[in-house]
């Protein structure tokens, strides 16, 4: 499967899932993005169009992490959960953004659940 086909497939899945996955202020959308090297997570309120909380492997304390990308993704999940709980958010809607629920995506979700987010 060519790279163009993979990108088009992911975009179709992303568009299809966005219909049913909507975030509100009380239950925001946990949106993730996975690049080849990094992992990003955001809590988004779609009603007001605001990003409430962010976490990624690009932060200073995560840049020095030496381990696997899956371990780094788990830490990002724990960090987003800690920031969300500090902001008074416990329930979220998980948006995998067209990525398969496997590997780093699953590790981030598991880390967020371990730290106290409910989804």
UniProtKB/Swiss-Prot annotation:
Subunit note: Part of the 50S ribosomal subunit; part of the 5S rRNA/L5/L18/L25 subcomplex. Contacts the 5S and 23S rRNAs.
GO biological process, one term: translation
Protein name as it appears in the record: Large ribosomal subunit protein uL18
Signal peptide from the UniProt entry: none
HAMAP family attached to this UniProt entry: Ribosomal_uL18_B (MF_01337_B)
Molecular functions (GO terms): 5S rRNA binding; structural constituent of ribosome
Region (Disordered): 1-23
